[in-house]
Swiss-Prot record:
Protein encoded by which gene: pheT
Organism expressing this protein natively: Gloeobacter violaceus (strain ATCC 29082 / PCC 7421)
Family recorded in the similarity comment: Belongs to the phenylalanyl-tRNA synthetase beta subunit family. Type 1 subfamily.
GO cellular component, one term: phenylalanine-tRNA ligase complex
GO biological process: phenylalanyl-tRNA aminoacylation
Cofactors, names only: Mg(2+)
Protein name stated in the entry: Phenylalanine--tRNA ligase beta subunit
Entry's localization field: Cytoplasm
Binding, Mg(2+): 454, 460, 463-464
EC number: 6.1.1.20
Domain B5: 400-476
Enzyme superclass (EC): ligase
Catalytic activity, reaction form: tRNA(Phe) + L-phenylalanine + ATP = L-phenylalanyl-tRNA(Phe) + AMP + diphosphate + H(+)
Length: 785
C-alpha cells in the first residue's frame, strides 16, 4: 500500500523523517519496500509570472519569455510549450536547479541565438504526469512570486510503499497504518471525525440469501447528486495512492476504501431494476458485463449483487457496466457490505480480476467499522457532490464476537528473555487498540474488531508486545552452561541391546507394525488402511520371517537380522504396548564358499547368539522345552525363564511353516520381552569383584542322569554349592546309547575354581565333594568320576 506521509500526519502526531518512520515500520513487521521522497522532485522550482511572450526570431515553434520570479531581475527563458503566454503563473526552474525525474541540471544556454536562463516546467518534468502537452499553468489568479511550488503541487510529501502480511488486513488502510504508527511512536491518534446524517428506513429493501457469504449488507439511496470532478485535495490523495480519479462519487468510495479499508460501491439508482437488492450465488448460465466492458459467464461459485433478481455486480470484486455512475447520474445507491473472504477469492481467481476491493475482502474486512466507514462516505458525498441521503435498508446477520485472550507476563518474559514491566505491557496493548484488564497473575485482553483476524492466542499478544517494544531491545544472550546430558535408563539399555545385537552379527531391520488378522487375540483397527493389514502386530517374529523371505528371494543370504519394537497385546485391563527384541537367523552357506568353511547354522549357534546378547547383564536364564508355539519345531524350541517369569522364546522354524514360506528348515528365531529385561537390569545390584591374579584349578565331573532333567538344573545346583570358590561351570559332553542306562544320558561338566589366594588341594576337594553330594541327593545322579 502507498502511504502518504502528509496524510498520515493528519491522523497521528510524530516527529520522524520518512526514512526514520520507514525503519520503525520495517522493524515492526511492516516492510517499507521503497520511500518515494517527492520533496526533491521540485527542489528549487518556484512560482513565476510570464510578463512577456514573443515569438523566437529564429524558430517558428519557440517563444522568448520574460519571467518574474520575485528576485527583482527578470529572467529570459526560451520555451517551446504551445500554451506559453503572457500573464500566466507557472513553475520556473532557474539556472542551477536539478530536476531528478529528468536527471537534468539547468544551466544558462543560448538557444538559436537567444539566451535562456532557466525553464518553464511541465508536470511531466516534475514527475506528476507521464506525458504533458505543455507547461503547467496554475489556476490561481494571483500567487506570491518566488514561492516554492512543492506545496502547491503536492510535492512536499513522501510516499511509503508498505508491504503487509496476509493476516493483517487492517494494514491496507490509512487508519490501520496510523494505529500502528501511534503505537510505535507514542504519538496521539486523531482518527477522522464522522458527522453522518441519520438515514431513515423506507421503501428500499435489501435481502441476503447467503448469510455465510455476506453477513451484512447496507444500501443507502442518495438524491440530488451532482457528478463532477472531485476536489483537488481528494484527487491528489488518490493519485499519490496510485489510483486514477474518475468522478466525485467514485472517488469518494475509493477514498473511504483507502482511509478505512472498507470497500464501497455506488450504483446509478435510475439504472437499477425495480425490486429488492439481493445477495446470492449465481445461477448456471447467467452473465454479467463488468465495468471494464468484459462479458463474464457466471458459475454457481460466484457471489452476486442483484436488483430485482438481475445481476448488477460481482460482489466484492467489480460492479456492472449497466449501473455505472456517469455524468447524467442524479440518484445513487451506495453499497456497504461484508463478504466472506473465500467467496471473493474464488470469483477474483476465476476471472483473474484482482481489484483494490477484492484485495481487502480476501484478507477480511473489519465488520465492526462498517457503519463508521459508511457514515464517512455519506459525509464526503454531501460535501463533494451535494448528495442527500434519503432512505437506507440493512440486512444484518453479524455475530458480535467479544474475544478475550489471557496474557501472562511470566510467560511473556520466558518467551522474550527479558522482564518487561506490567505497566509497559499494558501501555503497548492499549496503544494498539486492545482493552486491557490487569490482574496479579495475568491480563485479560479484549481484542478489537480490526484485529480479530490475527489475534487468537497468548503467543499472538506476546508477538505484538515484542514488535512494538522493538526486537532490537532483546539483546542476544548465551544460554547458561548446561549440565552434561544423559539418556534415560530405558533408552540406554535399548541402545546397548542394539549394539550387542550388531556385535553378534545381526543386521537391524524395521518391519510394519500393522499385520493381518490371524492371531488369537488381535488388536483389530476400526478403520484400517487395507483389508490385509487390519490389525496391530502381537509379535515380531511374523514380520521378521517376511523380511527373511523377501531377502532370500533376492539372493541376500545368509541372513541374520534383529528388530527392536513394540507389540500390542490385550489383557483384562485393555490394550497395552510391550517392548520386544526379535531376531531371525538363517545360515545357509554363502555363495562362493567352495572350501565349505562356513558351518551350517544350528540351534546351538542360535542359542550362542542369544547368550552373547544376554551375557553382559549377568542374568541367569533357564531354558525349558516348549511346544506351545505352533510356528516352531516342537523338539527344538525353548522358553527362557528368569526367577520364575518368562523372558522369551528361542526355537527353530517348524518344517511345515518353513515349507509353506519356502524357507530353509534351519531357520531360527527368538523373541524376548525387552521391558522385562530392562526391569531385570535395573533391579540387579552392581557388584565389584577384583580380578584374581592367582591360578585357577579345574575339575571334571561326569554322571548318569535322567533325560527329563535339564542341564540348566544341574548348572544352577553346581553354582549354588560351589560358592564362593567356583568361577565357572560348562557342559563338556553329552552321550546317549550303548553303556548308558535306559532313560538316562551321560553328562560331563568342567568346573573352574579360583580365589584371592592359591588354592590348596584340601580347599578344592572340600567344595568339589560338596557339589558331588548335592547332585546325588537332589537329582539321584549316578556319579562316574
Amino acid at each position: 500500500m502507498r502511504v502518504s506521509f502528509n496524510w498520515l500526519q493528519e491522523y497521528v502526531e510524530f516527529d520522524f523523517t520518512p526514512s526514520e518512520l520507514a525503519e520503525k515500520l520495517t522493524m515492526a513487521g511492516f516492510e517499507v519496500e521503497h520511500v518515494e521522497d517527492r520533496r526533491t522532485w521540485a527542489a528549487g522550482v518556484v512560482v513565476g509570472r510570464v510578463l512577456e511572450c514573443a515569438p523566437h526570431p529564429q524558430a517558428d515553434r519557440l517563444h522568448v519569455c520574460r519571467v518574474d520570479i520575485g528576485t527583482g531581475r527578470l529572467l529570459n527563458i526560451v520555451c517551446g510549450a504551445p500554451n506559453a503566454r503572457a500573464g500566466i503563473y507557472a513553475p520556473v526552474a532557474p539556472v542551477g536547479t536539478y530536476l531528478p525525474i529528468k536527471d537534468l541540471k539547468l544551466r544558462a544556454a543560448s538557444i538559436r541565438g537567444m539566451p535562456s536562463e532557466g525553464m518553464l516546467c511541465s508536470l511531466e518534468e516534475l514527475g506528476l504526469e507521464k506525458a504533458s502537452e505543455g507547461i503547467h499553468i496554475f489556476p490561481e489568479a494571483s500567487l506570491p512570486l518566488g514561492l516554492d511550488v512543492g506545496p502547491l503541487l503536492g510535492l512536499d510529501d513522501a510516499i511509503l510503499e508498505v508491504a503487509s502480511t496476509a493476516n493483517r488486513a487492517d494494514a491496507l488502510s490509512m487508519v490501520g497504518i496510523a494505529r500502528e504508527v501511534a503505537a510505535l511512536t507514542g504519538g496521539i491518534l486523531r482518527l477522522p471525525l464522522v458527522d453522518a446524517p441519520l438515514v431513515p428506513r423506507g421503501d428500499l429493501a435489501a435481502r441476503i440469501a447467503e448469510p455465510e457469504a455476506c453477513p451484512v449488507y447496507t444500501a443507502t439511496l442518495l438524491e440530488e447528486v451532482a457528478v463532477g470532478p472531485a476536489p483537488d485535495w481528494l484527487r491528489e490523495r488518490l493519485e499519490k495512492a496510485g489510483m486514477r480519479p474518475i468522478n466525485n462519487v467514485v472517488d469518494v468510495t475509493n477514498y473511504v476504501l483507502l482511509e478505512w479499508g472498507q470497500p464501497l460501491h455506488a450504483f446509478d439508482a435510475d439504472r437499477l431494476a425495480a425490486g429488492t437488492l439481493g445477495v446470492r450465488f449465481a445461477h448456471k448460465g447467467e452473465q454479467l458485463v463488468t465495468l471494464d466492458g468484459t462479458e463474464r459467464p457466471l458459475t454457481p461459485a460466484n457471489l452476486l449483487i442483484t436488483a430485482g433478481e438481475r445481476p448488477v455486480a460481482l460482489a466484492g470484486v467489480m460492479g456492472g457496466e449497466a449501473t455505472e455512475v456517469g455524468g447524467q447520474t442524479r440518484r445513487i445507491v451506495l453499497e456497504a457490505a461484508i463478504f466472506d473472504p473465500p467467496a471473493i477469492r474464488r470469483s477474483a481467481r476465476v476471472f483473474a480480476l484482482r481489484t483494490e476491493a477484492s484485495a481487502r475482502y480476501e484478507r477480511g474486512v473489519d465488520a465492526s467499522a462498517l457503519e463508521h466507514a459508511l457514515g464517512r462516505a455519506l459525509q464526503l458525498l454531501a460535501d463533494c457532490a451535494g448528495a442527500r441521503a434519503v432512505v437506507q435498508a440493512t440486512d444484518d446477520y453479524r455475530r458480535r464476537e467479544n474475544r478475550v485472550v489471557s496474557l501472562r507476563p511470566e510467560r511473556l518474559a520466558q518467551i522474550l528473555g527479558e522482564d518487561i514491566p506490567d505497566a509497559e505491557i499494558a501501555r503497548v496493548l492499549k496503544n494498539l487498540g486492545f482493552d486491557v484488564q490487569t490482574g496479579p497473575q495475568e491480563f485479560a485482553v479484549t481484542v478489537p474488531g480490526h484485529r480479530l483476524r490475527d489475534i487468537e492466542r497468548e503467543i499472538d499478544l506476546i508477538e505484538e508486545v515484542a514488535r512494538v517494544v522493538g526486537y532490537d531491545r532483546f539483546a542476544p544472550t548465551l544460554p547458561p552452561p548446561a549440565d552434561g546430558g544423559y539418556l534415560p535408563f530405558e533408552d540406554f539399555i535399548e541402545r546397548r541391546v542394539r549394539s550387542l545385537c550388531q556385535g553378534a552379527g545381526l543386521t537391524e531391520v524395521v518391519t510394519y507394525s500393522l499385520a493381518p488378522d490371524r492371531d488369537q487375540q488381535p488388536v483389530v483397527l476400526s478403520n484400517p488402511l487395507s483389508a490385509e493389514l487390519n490389525s496391530l502386530r502381537t509379535n515380531l517374529i511374523d514380520g521378521l520371517l517376511e523380511i527373511l523371505r523377501f531377502n532370500r528371494s533376492q539372493g541376500n543370504m545368509p541372513f541374520h537380522a534383529f528388530e527392536v519394537g513394540v507389540v500390542f497385546l490385550r489383557s483384562d485391563e485393555g490394550i497395552f504396548e510391550s517392548g520386544r527384541l526379535g531376531a531371525v537367523m538363517c545360515g545357509e552357506p554363502a555363495v562362493g564358499d567352495w572350501q565349505k568353511l562356513t558351518p551350517p547354522f544350528d540351534w546351538f549357534a542360535a542359542k550362542g547368539v542369544l547368550a552373547a546378547i544376554l551375557q553382559p547383564w549377568q542374568i541367569e536364564v533357564e531354558y525349558q522345552a516348549d511346544r506351545r508355539d505352533e510356528r516352531l519345531h516342537p523338539g527344538r524350541t525353548a522358553s527362557l525363564w528368569v526367577s520364575g517369569e518368562r523372558l522369551g522364546t528361542l526355537g527353530q522354524l517348524h518344517p511345515r511353516l518353513a515349507s509353506r514360506l519356502d524357507l530353509p528348515e534351519q531357520t531360527f528365531v527368538f523373541e524376548i520381552d525387552l521391558d522385562f529385561l530392562i526391569d531385570l537390569v535395573r533391579e540387579r545390584p552392581v557388584e565389584f569383584r577384583s580380578f584374581s591374579p592367582f591360578p585357577p584349578a579345574a575339575r571334571d565331573l561326569s554322571f548318569y542322569a535322567r533325560e527329563a532333567l535339564t542341564v540348566f538344573e544341574f548348572e544352577r545346583l553346581i553354582r549354588e554349592q560351589g560358592e564362593p570358590l567356583l568361577e565357572s561351570v560348562a557342559l563338556l559332553d553329552e552321550f546317549k546309547g550303548q553303556g548308558v542306562p535306559e532313560g538316562c544320558r551321560s553328562l560331563a561338566f568342567r568346573m573352574v575354581y579360583r580365589s584371592d589366594h592359591t588354592l590348596t588341594e584340601e580347599e578344592i576337594t572340600a567344595v568339589h565333594q560338596r557339589v558331588r553330594q548335592a547332585l546325588a541327593e537332589r537329582y539321584s545322579v549316578d556319579l562316574r568320576s
